[in-house]
UniProtKB/Swiss-Prot annotation:
Pfam families: ABC_tran. Residues 5-242 form the ABC transporter domain. This is Hemin import ATP-binding protein HmuV. It is found in: Cell inner membrane. The complex is composed of two ATP-binding proteins (HmuV), two transmembrane proteins (HmuU) and a solute-binding protein (HmuT).
Length: 269
């Protein structure tokens, strides 16, 4: 499996606080990786480092065996596509115009089938003439996801399998569209894309990801297949809650959270 993105002892400090602490990871073509962890663990900071939006205080990041810093912004956009957690939605463009932005400088005629395909896959074709600010939060999220899919398709047509980064992509979506989004991401992984998604819903993560990376206090504390990674002890330690863990027929775990019980000021069991 060819590595798409690798980090080597990556650390990020801001104002004396260590947000990411000595991260070593490698994600290859065809992997669907979910990053999970509590709020403030460093997940979004790590994703911004992988996207090139932030530069690490220490360590090195390689995208397709080249230093991430060696890519220009234009080059980077053809090798990785990112759906950020917070996207500016005040500009008065239509859904179709937003999705077409993913094609960059590609001619409109050439981009047209990619735009149509992405809108169909994300089920936003009926919204194509609507201006973005008039949509619900979930509809806006799906529009931006379609834009990112177009960007990814354009880049992979030129350079082969790329990197898809998703920062809490399901946060504004109802259950149906949460499942559809992660299934779409999974299809990209099966076609060779390296997919890394921050997911807060552990059941979504363990059901659809082939690999789980658990971040706690800026460091990786677990990394592996869902059935081996998500354990009762890890849930207690990292998330400070109890959960009954059951298993699907394929061995993937299902988490059934228990009511939280206080064991002292600021502590939960």
């Amino acid at each position: 499996m060819r590595p798409i993105i690798e980090t080597h002892s990556v650390t990020m400090r801001i104002n004396g606080a260590t947000l990411v602490d000595g991260i070593d990871l490698s994600v290859g073509s065809g992997e669907m990786v979910a990053i999970v962890g509590p709020n403030g663990a460093g997940k979004s900071t790590l994703l911004r480092l992988l996207s090139g939006d932030l530069q690490p205080t220490q360590g090195r990041i390689e995208l397709k065996q080249a230093d991430l810093r060696s890519y220009s912004a234009a080059q980077l956009a053809t090798h990785r596509a990112t759906l950020s957690q917070h996207v500016n939605v005040t500009f008065p463009f239509t859904v179709e115009e937003i999705v077409r932005m993913g094609a960059g400088d590609m001619a409109i005629a050439a981009a047209h089938p990619l735009v149509e395909s992405a809108m169909d896959e994300v089920a936003i074709r009926p919204l194509r003439s609507r201006q973005l600010p008039t949509l619900s939060g979930g509809e806006q999220q799906r529009t931006h996801f379609a834009r990112v899919l177009v960007q990814l398709a354009c880049g992979e047509a030129r350079h082969g399998p790329g990197l898809l980064l998703l920062d809490e992509p399901t946060s504004s979506l109802d259950l149906r569209h949460q499942i559809e989004l992660v299934e779409i991401a999974g299809r990209r992984a099966r076609n060779g894309t390296a997919v890394i998604a921050i997911l807060h819903d552990l059941n979504l993560a363990v059901r659809f990801a082939s690999r789980i990376i658990v971040i706690h206090r800026g460091a990786i504390v677990a990394d592996g297949p869902p059935a081996q990674t998500i354990t009762d002890g890890l849930i207690r330690k990292v998330f400070e809650v109890c959960a009954d863990i059951q298993y699907h027929g394929d061995g993937s775990p299902v988490l059934l959270p228990q009511a939280m019980k206080s064991i002292g000021p600021g502590n939960l069991l």
